[in-house]
Amino acid sequence: MRVTIAKRSASGHFPLPSSLACRLTEAMRVLAIDPAVRNTGYAILEGDPRKPTVLGYDVINIPARIPQSAALSAIRTHLVNLIKKHQPDEVAVEGIIFVQSHKTAISMGAARAAALIAAADHGLSVYEYSPKKVKMAVVGKGTADKAQVAFMVRALLGLAETPPSDAADALAIGLAHLQASDPLRAKLLDRRLV
């Protein structure tokens, strides 16, 4: 077995491996999703986790009179259109949370499935983050409320106005995902490939 030692450059630094150098120079684009049957928040962010660029965010609002199957189809279609338009490198979603109602859990799981299918149909890797870890990454405490998350998202991203709650959650998920591009932060944020 032969071992080669990297030579220092003229500046005295060791060169970066080509795969890492490429990763550091290319801006990652992420589609972040806060899935729900009636109000799915989404955000598209790009770039360095310390200074990301917001390419867009909104909430997919589905009226209550629309049957759940049609709502899920609409969510998937909307997300597919976003994927085609923005061409994200990866997708980040909120992990499953504990809820008291079985009906709510099933509904949330169905919306999440619509998002996962939209990403899988386009060959995108999907990563999930627990709400607690997202709050920790953005606010600094895992028990932050929605208003604190929205405030910090606005401040960190330099937004002119506070985004709607579900969109703010998606922006926070996107910020956490960009932070997790650092391997150490990925471990702290408990980044999981879905």
Predicted regions and their residues:
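Phosphate- and other anionic-substrate recognition elements at nucleic-acid/protein interfaces
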Residues: 1-14, 19-194
